[in-house]
Amino acid sequence: MRKLLLIVILFSSFFSQAQTKLYVHPDGKTYASNTKTIAILPLKVQVKLRPKQLKDFTTEQIIQLQKDEAIDIQKAMHTWFLTRKKRGSFDAKVITPARANALLKKADIDVHELDAYLPSELGEILGVDCVVMGTFETSKPMSNAASIALGALFGAFGTTQTAVCNIDFYNTADDELVVNYFKKIRGTIGSDAQDMINILMRKVTRRIPYTN
């Protein structure tokens, strides 16, 4: 009985620490095979600090922290895709974050308010077949500036962190959602944005039609 109870507890603990949901369009492989260029855009980031941490920051500082986090994650995802490309599991061209953000800025689009635009509108400006966008929530900011600031105020973070990532791959020709990847993880998610992306995207590479 004790062994059974222990197994149930361990299973429940594992399930609460990591939850993954993946949607792939029935014609996902066709969409992916027709994709020649991809743009990875800044995610909509929300950093959920504890009340003790929040009181030492202004609203403007929190907003800037989230914007910095979004750019860091965008760059980390770009690197992740380039690594897949180098390994031969990814063929499409990925435009750089600097180019994507500059083109959007030139079109008077705030890169942190992309949910106000259709993927087709963004795709036309960027000249890409697919845009990657979504949301990200975390209890621990990964950007260097934020980590240094919070570390100075409150000391090192504990090992337990929470992150919820919801990433969408849209075909820009018809605004079709080709892939939705949702992952919630509780535990150690790395020391920077690149570590975090590697952990969040682990084991899903071969299940996404763009990278299998």
Model-derived segments and spans:
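Sec-dependent N-terminal signal peptides
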Residues: 3-14
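Charged helix-capping and loop-helix junction motifs
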Residues: 116, 151-152
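C-terminal/domain-edge helix-coil "capping" segments
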Residues: 19-49, 125, 136-147, 154-212
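N-terminal segment of the mature soluble domain
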Residues: 44-46, 50-133, 172-183, 203, ...
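Histidine- and/or cysteine-centered catalytic micro-motif in compact active-site loops
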Residues: 3, 97, 136-139
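A generic structural signal for short, solvent-exposed coil/turn residues
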Residues: 10-12, 32, 86, 159
